[in-house]
Regions:
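Short glycine/serine/threonine-enriched helix-capping/active-site loop
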Residues: 8, 35, 62-66, 160, ...
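Glycine-rich, basic loop-to-helix element that forms the pyrophosphate-binding segment
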Residues: 8-28
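Acidic metal-phosphate-binding loop of nucleotide-sugar-dependent transferases
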Residues: 12, 40-41, 137
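Short beta-strand-to-loop acidic/aromatic patch adjacent to the donor-nucleotide binding site
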Residues: 29-41
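Active-site-adjacent helical/loop segments in soluble small-molecule enzymes
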Residues: 140
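Active-site-adjacent helix/loop segment of glycosyltransferases
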Residues: 148, 152-183
Length: 183
């Protein structure tokens, strides 16, 4: 694989660091940008179905695959996120299905409130239209903010369950909690 390392000289956080990469990819003519946490394990060929799904509808701004916890007591079928839900009245957001055993209950494609930045495939044209991730969110909630901006501009945010990854939650940030987050 061809890898480009970009030295920023300081810790820009999840948001700022990803924005540096996003700008680089946009300058290189990327059609899609994938944000992928470094504490994830991907299934073989997980990306192709996501791209094909995005190709099916130009109004899709971003998509998440099904995301499992890496390992819960030896089980690898415990859901970490099946897209995101947000309640603006309560100023709360959470990952759909979090902590539930996957028995097929989240196997339908659907529109969601937000797509988590853990594994977020974004359409480049939408980034150009609505902007980068908001850097006042050093880490966390930048994905929710970006998703809401995309939706406010007429785009949709989708969950696509027919491909998946595993997330070793908090390993890179030492954050163990994440069931419910204030926005």
């Amino acid at each position: 694989p061809n890898v480009t390392f970009i030295e920023t000289g300081k810790n820009l956080g999840f948001t700022g660091g990803n924005n540096v990469g996003i700008v680089h990819a946009l300058h290189k003519g990327a059609d899609y940008i994938l944000l992928l946490n470094n504490d994830t394990i991907v299934a073989n060929n997980f990306l192709t179905p996501l791209i094909n799904f995005m190709e099916s509808d130009e109004q899709i701004a971003a998509v998440n695959p099904k995301i499992y916890f890496e390992d819960v007591d030896g089980q690898k079928n415990i859901i970490w996120a099946a897209g995101g839900e947000a309640n603006l009245k309560l100023a709360k957001s959470n990952n759909r299905g979090r902590g539930r055993v996957d028995s097929g209950q989240f196997d339908s494609i659907c529109t969601v409130s937000f797509a988590t930045g853990c594994c977020l495939l974004m359409r480049a044209t939408v980034i150009r239209e609505i902007g980068l991730l908001t850097e006042s969110y050093f880490a966390y909630f930048e994905d929710t903010d970006w998703s809401f901006r995309a939706k406010a501009n007429g785009f949709s945010i989708k969950y696509y369950p027919h491909t998946h990854i595993w997330h070793a939650v908090g390993k890179s940030s030492q954050r163990k909690n994440g069931n419910s987050q204030k926005t």
